[in-house]
Amino acid sequence: MALSCGIRTLKNVAVPLKRYPTIAACGLDCGLCPRYYTVGKSRCPGCCGPDFAEKHPTCSFITCCVKRKGLEACGECPEFPCAKFKSTEEYRAAEVSAYPPARKMLPNLHFIKKYGIARFVQQQRQRIRLLESMLGGFDDGRSRSFYCRAAALLGLRGVEGALRKAKR
């Protein structure tokens, strides 16, 4: 049985607590992470995706943001940035992390706060589409992290242009 981080019932229909597992409550860009595209046991299903609770049994961001407040990401919360972000060394380290999804945690949340989750997800889906095109057409089996990094950190126009040139 797949364990997610929670289900709510609406009109007798089970509905996941999160609609978008590709953006984590904490701002991690799950949909652009190499582990999201890994085949096998180490694959991460994204925030609150199937089997998420087995891989990540406790997450204070999910408890506060998703379960208590019913939000997709902390950037939707009127209290963001709360003391949790201001006092978390993890976020200071994330800004200089070599792990691409971590470098975008706070910028993602600030974008969501300013423009909303729908606009963020729209742009993220463009990045995911480009990443999946790179992985499907050019991955030699060892380039997944490189392509994830490009999709996460480079501008959309730059990635689209490079992909067009590569396809010629």
What positions do the PLM features span?
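Short loop/turn segments that flank or connect secondary-structure elements
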Residues: 3-7, 75-167
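N-terminal cysteine/histidine-rich coordination modules
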Residues: 5-62, 67-74
